């Protein structure tokens, strides 16, 4: 899979630096919709998930548009259950 074939729910390693202020930093796995983290707290706009054997959260409160050049490597896909929960959180966030 190349960065040209990106689908909702795919997980890519994304180079997020440089950043400003409190933007999420580092090169980290990101769901194509929101970044993933194994740290942090379970805030209302974060969706618990397990990926690559690690428990973490989809950080839906840190949405960011990125250019395809920032996509380092395709890592896999978010589970259907976690993706559906994420889409529900996004609907609540944006009141759609």
Regions found by a protein language model. Give the residues of each.
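Conserved functional hotspots at enzyme active or ligand-binding sites that engage polyanionic ligands
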Residues: 1-96
């Amino acid at each position: 899979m190349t960065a040209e074939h990106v689908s909702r729910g795919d997980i890519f390693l994304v180079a997020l630096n440089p950043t400003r202020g409190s933007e999420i930093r580092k090169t980290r796995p990101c769901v194509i919709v929101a970044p993933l983290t194994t740290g942090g707290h379970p805030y209302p706009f974060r969706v618990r998930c397990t990926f690559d054997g690690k428990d973490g959260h989809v950080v839906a409160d840190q949405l960011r548009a990125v250019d395809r050049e920032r996509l380092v490597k395709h890592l896999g896909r978010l589970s259907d259950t976690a993706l559906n929960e994420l889409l529900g959180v996004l609907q609540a966030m944006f009141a759609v």
